[in-house]
UniProtKB/Swiss-Prot annotation:
Organism whose genome encodes this protein: Yersinia pestis
A GO cellular-component term linked to this record: plasma membrane
Function: Part of the binding-protein-dependent transport system for D-methionine and the toxic methionine analog alpha-methyl-methionine. Probably responsible for the translocation of the substrate across the membrane.
Subcellular localization(s) per the UniProt record: Cell inner membrane
Classification via InterPro entries: AA_ABC_Transporter_Permease, MetI-like, MetI-like_sf
GO biological process: D-methionine transmembrane transport
Protein name: D-methionine transport system permease protein MetI
Residues annotated as domain ABC transmembrane type-1: 13-204
Length: 217
């Protein structure tokens, strides 16, 4: 492999990491409050509202059901309106964020559902407000589950970013498609594959260690 290709690979790794972590961050900015709202508005919860819950749940399910490659193409006009282009690193972050947010919201809801109901009831009995329960009970108790959700999301986004590379998003996916598939270069394709596996492994390893650190003894 030439030196130029090695530099291209290094740039691809950087672009993949940027797409993954930036879209993961914005995905959590959108998905975390939606997930919390899904939990607290469920029947029997602290601010139960069946209409809000069904509406939010329906929207989340709709976006979760759309395959990412279709979402990527469908969002081209919106992406172009937001960042001024439909190709490249910045353009990829928009559909990646939209694709990640409903996935995160549902995992946040599931993490909160694992909290023993007795903790919430005890907080309510002591006169805690819904916001206090969310900040002082729900989020701290669900932290290991939320970290695990973040880990799964980032790994999923690595795969999404690789798919986005096939339509000009950049990163390792574009290198693998352009030079490996179109250019019939097995060495490039195998190198991209190995790098993606390493990225996923490192993300999972880091996530497991953080979960262990924040888990209540």
């Amino acid at each position: 492999m030439s030196e130029a290709m090695m530099w291209l690979m290094a740039r691809g790794v950087w672009e993949t990491l940027m797409m993954t972590f930036v879209s993961g961050f914005f995905g959590f900015v959108l998905g975390l409050p939606v997930g919390v709202l899904l939990y607290v508005t469920r029947p029997g919860q602290i601010i139960a509202n069946n209409k809000i819950y069904r509406t939010l749940s329906g929207v989340v399910n709709i976006f979760r059901s759309i395959p990412f490659i279709i979402l990527l193409v469908w969002m081209i006009p919106f992406t172009r309106m937001i960042v001024g282009t439909s190709i490249g690193l910045q353009a990829a972050i928009v559909p990646l964020t939209v694709g990640a947010a409903p996935f995160i919201a549902r995992m946040v809801e599931n993490a909160l559902l694992e909290i023993p109901s007795g903790l919430v009831e005890a907080a309510r009995a002591m006169g805690a407000t819904p916001m206090q329960i969310i900040k002082k009970v729900l989020l701290p108790e669900a932290l290991p589950g939320l970290v695990n959700a973040a880990t799964i999301t980032l790994i999923t986004l690595v795969g999404y970013s690789a798919m986005g590379g096939a339509v000009g998003a950049g990163g390792l996916g574009q290198i693998g498609y352009q030079y490996g598939y179109i250019g019939y270069n097995a060495t490039v394709m195998n190198t991209v594959l190995v790098l993606l596996v390493i990225l996923v492994y490192l993300i999972q390893l880091s996530g497991d260690r953080i979960v262990k650190a924040v888990t209540h003894k």
